[in-house]
Amino acid sequence: MELKGVQPSNGSSNGSGNGATNAASTEKTDAEKPTAERTNWGNGLEFLMSCISVSVGLGNVWRFPFTAYENGGGAFLIPYIIVLFLIGKPMYYLEMIMGQFTSQGTVKIWSVVPGFVGVGYGQAFGTICIISYYSSLLALTLYYLFVSFQSELPWSYCRDEWTNCVNSRPQEYVDNLLTGVSLANESARNLSGIVANDETEKLQSSSELYFLNVVIKEKLDISDGVGDPDWKLTLALFVAWVVIFLVIMRGVKSSGKAAYFLALFPYVVLFVLLIRAVTLEGARDGILFFLEPQWGELLNPTVWKEAVVQCFFSLAVGSGPIIMFASYNRFDHGIYRDAMIVTTLDTLTSLLGGITIFAILGNLAHNLQIENIRDVVRSGTGLAFISYPDAISKFQAVPQLFSVLFFFMLFVLGIGSIVALQSTIVTIICDQFKGWKYWKVALTTSVCGFLMGLVYVTPGGQWILTLVDFYGGTYVVFILAIFELAGIVWVYGLQNFCDDIEFMCNRRVSLYWRVCWSFFTPVMMIIIFIYSMVTIEPIKYSELYFPEAANIAGWLLFAIGAAQFPLWGLWYISRHPQGTYWKSLKASLKPSDRWGPANPEIRREWVIFKNQKAAQRATQKDTSKLGFFWRKVANFCGSNK
């Protein structure tokens, strides 16, 4: 592929890669015009810490343990690690490369294949959906953090009006059990519920009733609306957004400094909780329950689907933060090392978080004299705000301290993730409108985020959270990630992409990356997405089905996100006609003049490098079929010839 728009003065050069110094043509295209220099990270460590803070987040401590438990326990680690190496790492590295190579955000990088610009806008839509409910989780976390400073944890005892309540205090739990009360094992919703011997009245733990009746004031039917926002949660939501704005207001200059704390502090707390958890009675049973493999689950396609969903959720690929962070790197930054560190650390943290959480749940089962730990595990929001508080309230020594540490850790993890997501949206807007002040865009989007989050702090908010996460987050991000990979590797071309990497990183791309990007990663993602669509079932909240109107709204949400891809593609074609529609379509699938490194000097060297590569391949061309075959194999495998 010979590049035009910026040509070496003599048409060729004997220099190579970054060392090329030939003068370029005096005529400048749009791609060469001076642009405002992009702010860079203070140092490479800030970038690494920022990536850790977004990838090592709530998904590791909150979502991974239950996902693993639901999908084969220890056996889930096998498909998860396979998915990590065949999908997670390749997608993570690819997004890092795209961001650093172009120094552009999620939308602007699509100068590589302009007809695919809708992928960037669709990912922005999915990111907005995730931001909208993620901030409400921070509000819940802040609420529990604040009330943990009381002399007695408020969820550890029953209110007078709760006639079906059992205190979460350790001794009183035992007293109730000894008088003939047994734990119900009917559904995930009743994880802490206890049923009397005559089973005429279901009893629930005070931690569950506190969350449902005091904190979220849960509605079991949203057909008549979701209700009004709770003022306490609204205040907590406001505080969360103030913190988010303060972190992102100066771009990477402020978020880069905060990243050290956001990335490292959770590990301090996690290790403190781990040490405390493994010393609790019953912890061993909980850990074994988490790690014990259910080998039969490996043949279940749903397990592999959940491994992919968890990998995407945990690493934050497909939604833009990795591209955005990498776009603020220096062009020659060593991202290969960072990609390997973050993806490996993410997996180890998930395992560490799972061991810690199930050690605590094992202690909870021990205190309740329950043999099957399955009965104390709850999915979704309930795991963080019912099971964990219930277990912490039974700590014999200073439960308030461990409660404060735990919820502060969750808050920091959540801030690290949402800061990256919010910065992605701000970067997209600032890339599009160069003259706009970053802090003003950050303030405006933060206000919008707060207003969107109000619906989630209503009595029916958990219903909306489940709906938006399912339709607007998971599936929108997943399908657009497939188009993202296809656009870069199949449309722009694997060889072109690998040449760009070689120029930027000064190293050939190994066979592992080439095989994953061109075959394993896209094929696995397509198969899993099709399977997910074929086997999709109506979603439920707390064992209750959503109203039909809610499901229609959910599918509409998915359609809006997915439709960004074709609609923006058609928009580009209509704005750049090339005579016939077919010619316009073909032109939209070729790189625009703006594709390439943002720095004009580096761009000129890159054009020389690419033209040299094209010339080398032309001279190596063999007319025989066998020679042609071996040349293609050599190029695919990364041969230096």
Swiss-Prot record:
Originating organism: Drosophila melanogaster
Glycosylation sites: 185, 190
Region (Disordered): 1-38
Compositionally biased region (Low complexity): 9-26
Single GO BP term: neurotransmitter transport
Protein's recorded name: Sodium-dependent nutrient amino acid transporter 1
Database matches in InterPro entries: Na/ntran_symport (IPR000175), SNS_sf (IPR037272)
Bias kind Basic and acidic residues: ranges: 27-36
Cytoplasmic side, ranges: 1-40
Function: Unusual broad substrate spectrum amino acid:sodium cotransporter that promotes absorption of the D isomers of essential amino acids. Neutral amino acids are the preferred substrates, especially methionine and phenylalanine.
Tissue: In larvae, weak specific expression in the anterior midgut just proximal to the gastric caeca reproductive rudiments, common ureters of the Malpighian tubules, and distal swollen portion of the anterior pair of Malpighian tubules. Expression is also seen in the imaginal disks of the head; brain hemispheres and the ventral ganglion. Stronger expression in the posterior midgut.
